[in-house]
C-alpha cells in the first residue's frame, strides 16, 4: 500500500508549485478516491488502471469545478484496465511544450495539458508507504502524506532509464 512511480518532479509538495509529470500507482486501505495507476501532470490525472469503482462521476465533477477537488480527472474510463503491473513494461513520457503524452509498451494512454509557469524538474523514481491527500484549507497549502502500514516487502524494479 502507498505510492510508486516514475517520471519528473520539481520536488515540491506546495499546491501551487508542485509539478509532477509521471506515472503514479496509488493504493490505500480505507476510503481514498484514487485507487489505481495514473498518468499525471500537475493536478491533472488520467486513469490507466483502476482498482475500485468507475471514476466517471468524479471525473465529471472535477472537470466542471476546474479542479476544486484538488485534481482534474480527465476520464472515468481507464486506458488499459487489463494492464498487468506485475509484468515488465516499457513506459514513455513525452514532455513537449503545452502537453505531455504517456505511453505503455508503445500504446498511447494519455495526453495531459502543461500550462502556466516554466517547468524544471528532475527524473524521479520512487516507492513509498504513503498516498497523498488534498485539503484546500490546509494551513501549509501542501499535499499531506497518508501513511500506509506495510507488513511485507515491496519492490519497484527498474531495468533502465533513458532521458533524451
What are these regions (language model features)?
Residues 118-164:
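Ligand-recognition surfaces built from glycine- and aromatic
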Residues 65-80:
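Surface-exposed cleft-lining segments at the edges of enzyme active sites
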Residues 1-63:
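Secretory/extracellular carbohydrate-interaction modules
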Residues 87-95, 100-102:
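Short tryptophan-centered beta-strand motifs in secreted/extracellular beta-sheet-rich domains
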Residues 103-107:
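Short strand-turn-strand beta-turns centered on an Asx-Gly dipeptide
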Residues 113-114:
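Short clusters of small/polar residues that mark proteolytic maturation junctions
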Residues 80-87:
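Extracellular/lumenal carbohydrate-interaction signature centered on repeated Trp-anchored short motifs
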Amino acid at each position: 500500500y502507498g505510492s510508486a512511480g516514475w517520471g519528473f518532479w520539481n520536488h515540491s509538495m506546495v499546491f501551487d508549485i508542485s509539478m509532477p509529470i509521471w506515472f503514479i500507482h496509488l493504493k490505500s486501505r480505507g476510503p481514498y478516491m484514487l485507487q489505481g495507476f495514473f498518468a499525471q501532470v500537475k493536478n491533472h490525472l488520467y486513469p490507466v488502471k483502476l482498482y475500485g469503482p468507475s471514476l466517471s462521476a468524479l471525473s465529471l465533477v472535477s472537470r466542471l469545478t476546474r479542479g476544486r477537488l484538488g485534481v482534474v480527472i480527465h476520464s472515468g474510463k481507464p486506458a488499459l484496465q487489463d494492464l498487468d503491473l506485475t509484468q515488465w513494461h516499457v513506459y514513455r513520457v513525452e514532455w513537449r511544450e503545452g502537453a505531455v503524452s504517456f505511453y505503455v509498451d508503445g500504446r498511447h494512454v494519455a495526453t495531459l495539458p502543461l500550462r502556466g509557469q516554466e517547468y524544471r524538474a528532475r527524473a524521479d523514481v520512487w516507492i513509498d508507504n504513503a498516498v497523498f491527500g488534498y485539503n484546500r484549507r490546509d494551513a501549509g497549502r501542501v499535499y499531506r502524506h497518508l501513511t500506509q502500514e506495510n507488513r511485507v516487502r515491496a519492490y519497484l524494479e527498474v531495468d533502465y532509464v533513458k532521458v533524451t
